[in-house]
Design a protein with these regions (language model features):
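Residues lining hydrophobic/aromatic ligand-binding pockets adjacent to catalytic sites
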Residues: 2-251
């Protein structure tokens, strides 16, 4: 099934997670416009301020300290970083310890060190700085905007429609279509004239630093292993299924 809408502008909307895992990175890389969904609530249990990297005895967490005490429910755009340079330096040391023998250690660490050297005070700024640096390293060009730059409200479905229209999108790419936890009525989205595409992601296999293979890690694990070639690896296996097309909705 193909999208036959003439000029396609593919939009993805997703929380700006920390050191995103490979599936999320591929979703952004395959989009024309990525809308960082920074108006949603910050949640500790998500990957907003933590991510997994490879470890000798299994995946290891990297966590970013943020200010939550006394803040209650706060949107991602308002979450402040704490801890000065201590955790930044600790992250870089841990990454060095785990990846110093990787083929592209020097190049990728240089990218990360520059991003970590920034003076960001907000989590969303830091996360988007990292994402932008990794996209640039792999040669991927994507327009990155923030949800808070645009007027949007109502329920989850209405927000998706408004944000997609705000950047003149006619295709919305989702990574959660068909999952048990559906927060969006996709038939309403397609009724608004927007094609809905579902990301069908298969993680590439590559030589990691430790065996056996550890899936679902930050994309930096892939970059340390294969360098800029990661963009081509992901593009070659990329599949976006247009599951709902205006005029042909289905549940």
């Amino acid at each position: 099934m193909t999208v036959s809408q003439g000029c396609v502008t593919r939009i993805s909307v997703h929380q700006p997670n920390f050191l995103p895992w490979t599936k999320f990175f591929d979703k952004v890389a395959g989009s024309d416009v990525y809308i960082a969904y920074d108006s949603v609530q910050y949640t500790r249990s998500e990957f907003h301020s933590r991510q997994l990297i490879a470890g000798r005895n299994g995946p290891v967490w990297l966590s970013v300290p943020v200010l939550t005490r006394g803040r209650g429910r706060q949107p991602l755009c308002a979450v402040e970083l704490v801890g000065g340079r201590v955790w930044r330096d600790a992250h870089l040391r841990l990454l060095t310890e785990h990846y110093r023998h990787a083929p592209y250690f020097g190049a990728v660490m240089a990218v990360l060190e520059e991003a970590y050297a920034g003076d960001d005070t907000l989590l969303v700024d830091f996360n988007l700085r990292l994402l932008g640096a990794l996209l640039a390293y792999t040669g991927v060009t994507v327009r990155v905007v923030r949800a808070t730059w645009f007027d949007h409200g109502g329920d989850n479905t209405e927000r998706i429609i408004q944000l997609t229209r705000a950047v003149s999108g006619n295709v919305h790419l989702t990574s959660t279509y068909g999952t048990p936890r559906r927060y969006v009525d996709w038939n309403r989205v397609v009724a608004a004239g927007i094609t809905v595409e579902s990301q069908q992601f298969t993680e590439p296999l590559y030589r990691q630093q430790f065996e056996p293979f550890q899936p679902n890690l930050s994309v930096v694990d892939l970059l340390f292993a294969v360098g800029p070639a990661a963009a081509g690896m992901l593009s070659a296996r990329r599949k976006f299924d247009p599951v709902l097309t205006p005029g042909f909705p289905r549940s």
